[in-house]
Each structure stands twice: as C-alpha cells, then as structure tokens.
Amino acid sequence: MNKHTEAECKVIKSDGLEVEISSGSMTRLAGVSQGLVGAEGIHLAVANIPPGCASSPHHHVNCESAIYVSKGSGRFLTGPQLETTLDIEVGDFIYVPQGSVHQPINDSLSDPLELIVARNTPVEIVEEYEVS
C-alpha cells in the first residue's frame, strides 16, 4: 500500500544555504535542516576547512553523523584524547557515533577540505571539547 502526502519536495540552491556554525576554522552550511525546510528527522550540510586548518575538537550530543569526503584530504582525529588518527581522502565515508569526540584537519597547504555531513536529527547539539 502506498502512502501519499501533501508535503512537497524542495530544492535548496547553493545561494540559499543556511549558515550554521563555525568550529575552529571550519564553516558549515546546511541545505536540509529544520529551519530551512522543516525537516523532522534529518540534517544535511557541507563543511569546508581551509588549507592548513582544522575544526575545534567537538562532539555531537544528540546524533550520529555520516560524512563523505567530497574534496581534499587530511586527517580525522578521534578518541577522548584525540589519540586515534584516521587518514581521509576524496571518496571516503566516515561514521561518527553519538558523543564521539573528533576533529577533522586539512593538512594541505593549497587545497580546501570539503565534507558532506548527514545527521539523524534536524537540529544538532554540538559541544566543543577540551583535550586535557
């Protein structure tokens, strides 16, 4: 049996993205969010990290993340003391469990690192994390 609703599909153009957060040198723009399209269970954004820069160490209190590396390469630090280093490059997928401390780093001195980020909540709660 098919269910049909009156809800309409929406296209968000690149000039209509929602500016979200800056974490360290990383900026993130949402294309699908509660505020932008009324999403009820999903969030999709593009994160950009300039050459030689990184996000702040952080974790997401209320959601898992799935990340796709669409441009560039670098490292993805994870663990309570960011003690685990994962090399990342174009085409890689990254799974981040809820509450997992992480920090993407762009090692390139010339190319940006671009990450497509999906989450299983329309509104995320991000907490910056201080490594001791």
Walk through the language-model features, giving the residues of each.
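A short, N-terminal "cap"/entry segment at the start of jelly-roll beta-barrel domains
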Residues: 1-41, 56, 128-132
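Conserved hydrophobic/aromatic beta-strand scaffold that supports enzyme active sites
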Residues: 44-48, 66, 85, 93-95, ...
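A short beta-strand-loop-beta hairpin characteristic of the jelly-roll/cupin
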Residues: 54, 63-90
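Histidine-centered divalent metal-coordination motifs
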Residues: 58-60, 102
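Ligand-binding loop in jelly-roll beta-barrel domains
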Residues: 85, 89-90, 98-125
